[in-house]
Amino acid sequence: MTLEPRQAAPGALRRWILAALQLLWRGAGVWLALSLLMCLWIFVGHRLPLLSAMLALSALLGSILIAAQVDRSPRIRLADTLTMLRVHAPVTLRFSALITIAGAIIWVVLLAKPGVAWWNIFYTSRNALDILSPDGFVALRQIFVYSAFALGLCYFGLNIPGLTSIFQFPCMTLLGLPYRDALRLGAAGQIRNLNSVLAIGALFVVLPVLFGLLLPVLVPVLYCFFGALTYVAFREIFLGVSENRPRESAEARVAATPLSSCA
């Protein structure tokens, strides 16, 4: 079977945003709880940049998988979600580690300011926080600003030329392709939909800044949203499915239970 990425129909970004928000609403409880937990861990480990990057990437990639699960299942359960994430954990962690290491090398070689020690990628007290502000809103901003900043950088990590593509991870996990094949296929889909992908990139840059400053408590929602947005874009480009699958009716769910089948 040969997969050929499609060019999305006009109005793709608006369609993807609406579909992503619908998936987010359907799976909000468990999904948001896991995202919030990851954001809090990013805050706890904010002195360790590599760890924070790994956590942020894992949270975003995990959200892509959860979005696929929400789309396919009438109801999302914590046990099922954790099982699914555990199955894909090796690929998720390897891909996150690859991006983190590549990003660290790029920072050391090209982006580090003069006089900044290279080992700051492992541990830094710069911009570290010891005491939270007594003001509740400011304290929330202090907590979630690190995960907001990390989320904004994730887009660039997912688009390292010759190494990663924004659709590569779902190609590996949801289509079962090996790394190189997923990279080539993901890059082809990205090129065919360059304007829409660049618009997604603009959202990756702008929304974390706005939410980090104005709505910090909703930063975990952004991880879920961008995971869902990436998934629905992937789904339309590579699978030709532009709309979310409808939820099963309550009657169908009841009919599928063991009790109803024994009656």
Which residues does each PLM region occupy?
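Hydrophobic alpha-helical membrane segments
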Residues: 1-263
